[in-house]
Amino acid sequence: MSDEATIASLMAAEGGGPQQLNGLVERLSAGGLLRGAREGGRAIGPTALGEILVEDITDDSRAVRPGSLFVAVPGLHVDGHVFVASAAAAGAAAAIVERPLPDVALPQLVVERAAAALAESAAWWFGDPSRRLGVVGITGTDGKTTTSFLAVAALEAADVSCGLVGTVATQIGAVREANPEHTTTPGALLLQRTLRAMASADNDVAVVETTSHGLAADRVRGIAYDIAILTNLTHEHLEFHGSWEAYRDAKLSLFERLAVGPANPVKELGGRRWPKGAIVNADDPNAGAFAGVAQEAGARIVTYGTDSGADVRATHIEEDARRLRIGYEAPSGAAVLDLQLAGRFNVHNALAVVAMGEVLDLDPAAVRAGLAGVRGVPGRMERLAAGQPFGIVIDYAHSPASLEKVLDLLAPLAAARGGGVIAVFGSAGERDTEKRPMMGLIAAERARLVIVTNEDPRGEDPMTILEGIARGAEDGGKRRDRDLFLIADRRRAIEAAFERARPGDIVLLAGKGHEQSIIGPDGPVAYDERQTALAVLAGLGFVPDPAT
């Protein structure tokens, strides 16, 4: 592979060739999605459908070209059915719709769920690339990204070539690039194109961060998963799922997908037989539900954690501000794992990967070596030093549980230095409102100062979001303009934090992490937390030593 290869160039080389539509018709019918086919006001039979040649698939009417199959997906703000006529005018060969449009002279496959049909269409178009890869899906509220980085490191140390789809980065072949988007699990077409590029680049495995959104919205339908990992399950995304039960059920559906069948066969890849395995956090209250679903799917279950009944169990943990040392027992034997990562929460992330190694029968020493080599993950417990007398940590924590874990780590570290924590964070607009006061209370109970600011307000009034967080902080004893400040502009909030920081304090900048933008009412605006913090420090006279 050329040193000049980029993710874009690798992806551009991947596209399905022209295909007869009848192959997709059979697939949609077998999957229980197809309700019929029509053109205008009349039904279309199999013979006519078989004569239609598809040159491309898209769910974006602006990308339609002659021969395209246009999939009309109803969205939260825009319904794709509105654009079927314009797709026809642009030369589309056919459309997939949930409701027939008799006034549009275009062959239409009428389906139960267009999003699910889009995912099946994408898998069909790109030749089911997940069947040529071992696929490791990682789900959970927190810890997915760190666990995915650790999993890739362990697999590569065991001489297993890895691709990665995740919040922070995409990796195809040996090329890894930052993910500029705010979406962890991409849309079905991009996801299947990425998997095909991995297979073409001779990756053996795809490690895929698999979100509840991606599961519930059918983005990952058509992917043949082999390993499913649960990190944990806490309060998040209720604005999308509507209830805790629906959120949990979306996560559970990943483990249901481990069942062997025509769409998810047992794979023989590179001389390795890929088992179906479920890796479950034994310390999570929902462990039993996930293990039960995995058992019904026929997967091998390996649990991990500190619970005495866990298959991979931490027996001894030593930690300092920068490292972890974990003694553990596993089916392959007892061992000690050294990590260049701080935070007791990373014990579970690492043990999940050890458990994955047990299922895949990887060399335990290679797994430990891979884990030991991970020095950090962008935007996760990232320290910033420019000679200032206080600490700065950038972290992606944006849920109540993740914020609590990070503050529980930093508060005693700051206290040992004679200081406290200044927490700078916000909460996403047009998202779960219930978590806002929860996060405010968590910060108030652990931080010396709480500065509430924008995260991604989107179209919601920023001060409404900040007030929701402030209510929780006030319940925790904070008082406005004393130890609680509401500053919508994120740069100004960081300035306020640094100006108030005392020697020994630790300033936590939470919620943005690796992200490269803030989403406002008019869309994303470029923003880099690290560069912003460095610029503020420079204004205070602190500049990093270029030699360090």
Language-model segments: residues:
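Short secondary-structure boundary segments
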Residues: 97-100, 210, 232, 282, ...
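Phosphate-binding loop of NTP-binding sites
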Residues: 117-278, 289-297, 543-544
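Receiver (REC) domain switch/active-site residues of two-component response regulators
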Residues: 93, 226, 448
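N-terminal leader/targeting and accessory segments in enzymes
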Residues: 1-124, 278, 300, 310-313, ...
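Acidic, Mg2+-coordinating active-site environments of NTP-dependent enzymes
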Residues: 98-105, 201, 225-392, 472-473, ...
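Short loop/edge segments at beta-strand edges and connector loops
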Residues: 97, 112, 166, 210, ...
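Residue-level signal for inorganic ion chemistry
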Residues: 68, 87, 121, 138, ...
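ATP-dependent carboxylate-amine ligase
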Residues: 1-35, 63-69, 79, 149, ...
